[in-house]
Amino acid sequence: MMDNDKSKRVGICVYGASSSRIAAAYTAAARQLGALIAAKGWDCINGAGSQGLMRAATDGALQAGGTATGVIPKFMVDNGWAYSRLTRTIVTTDMHQRKRAMATMASAFVAMPGGCGTIEEMMEAFTWIQLGIIDSGKPLVVLNTNGYYNHLIAQVEQSAAEGFMKPSHRSLWHIAATPQQAIETIERAFGQEPQPVESKY
């Protein structure tokens, strides 16, 4: 159900695949990321998926004694796609509200490997930071497990090189090879501790 109480917390928005038909290395990295988020006392925010890397990140956070908040549109709940073990589930009216809620709640973003939906979420966050819709102080970290995003990273570099985006905008995201590097990148961006965010969600 929708929770409208305002609260101030540090939450890390984790984008990632809903597919489970992937190599075990991706699942292990997602679970480790969730555990590391929990170890810092931060909330693991994701799309509430019951499969794939979203579930793995949730499981990692919960098994480490932390919390996980899932944000999911009603039609996905109706289809039985929501993970029942989440600490808190926020149901939205549609995909747009889902993405807005996750962005509003987050102190930082980590994009794990994923398909079109994950890439769209990550690039929308990148664009929102660029446009000032999202606070530019919220770091966006690409978790490049097994070099999964090498081609996308190269595409962004090419866009900057050919004048389709400002070269300075390349600094709006950070690349991490491992979950530990992702956490360290977030801490460096804030000078150690991420800033808690006040949200209506």
Regions inferred by a protein language model and the residue ranges of each:
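A cross-family phosphate/adenosyl-ligand binding-site feature
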Residues: 2-105, 132-133, 143-180, 184-185, ...
